């Protein structure tokens, strides 16, 4: 986990790589799950009643499909990791660089259907935070606890597709997980005292500790 905490920001990125199975001609990581906020959202907020949307120009002006709900002109960080992240494998006689090799972009939970969920799902939501109330003044959002619940629902759907829980767990244990969340807990919570009470209840240090503790518990649920 990479974490940065100071008086005004907390940015957390988690990459969990449990195991990689090399299969000739196939994706080196069979599935990829994404949790977070607007830095990773790829369309989950499109149909929500919220000001935190990006499904209109100039967002997406450099993306092949135009505006999709990504809060960027083109690909976001999750897209770049999925397509270009390289993994080093120590072979017997030489080092080899292997591309993750996902054939397409991971779908947002809001529109993921059928067997495509076996390749992964993006649960990220603009304005979402570690704390459930974060970003509420902007409208609806899928906070981290709800993203984790959505992942649980995805797993149940995967069990139906795969046939049993044991095989599903074996599949999940080879997947890549990324979480990028926490900045909204400051810019859309702690630093908005007219809307939220956290600024008056906690010192900056206390609030940072509170976020880290809650985040740690959420990661245990995810894993």
Residue map of PLM features:
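Conserved active-site regions of diverse hydrolases
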Residues: 2-223
């Amino acid at each position: 986990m990479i974490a940065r905490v100071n008086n005004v920001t907390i940015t957390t990125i988690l990459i969990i790589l449990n195991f990689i199975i090399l299969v000739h001609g196939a994706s080196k990581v069979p599935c990829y799950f994404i949790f977070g906020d607007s830095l990773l959202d790829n369309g989950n907020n499109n149909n929500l009643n919220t000001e935190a949307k990006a499904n209109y120009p100039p967002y997406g002006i450099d993306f092949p499909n135009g505006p999709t709900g990504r809060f960027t002109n083109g690909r976001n960080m999750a897209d770049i990791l999925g397509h270009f992240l390289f993994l080093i494998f120590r072979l017997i006689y030489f080092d080899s660089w292997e591309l993750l090799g996902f054939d397409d972009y991971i779908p947002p939970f809001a529109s993921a259907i059928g067997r495509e969920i076996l390749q992964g799902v993006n649960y990220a939501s603009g304005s979402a935070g570690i704390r459930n109330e974060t970003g509420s003044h902007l409208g609806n959002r899928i906070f981290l606890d709800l993203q984790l619940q959505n992942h649980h629902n995805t797993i149940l759907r995967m069990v139906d597709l795969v046939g049993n829980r044991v095989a599903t767990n074996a599949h999940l244990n080879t997947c890549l997980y990324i979480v990028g969340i926490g900045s909204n807990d400051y810019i859309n919570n702690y630093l908005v005292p007219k809307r939220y009470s956290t600024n008056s209840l906690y010192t900056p240090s206390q609030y940072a500790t509170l976020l880290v503790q809650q985040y740690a518990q959420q990661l245990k649920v995810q894993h």
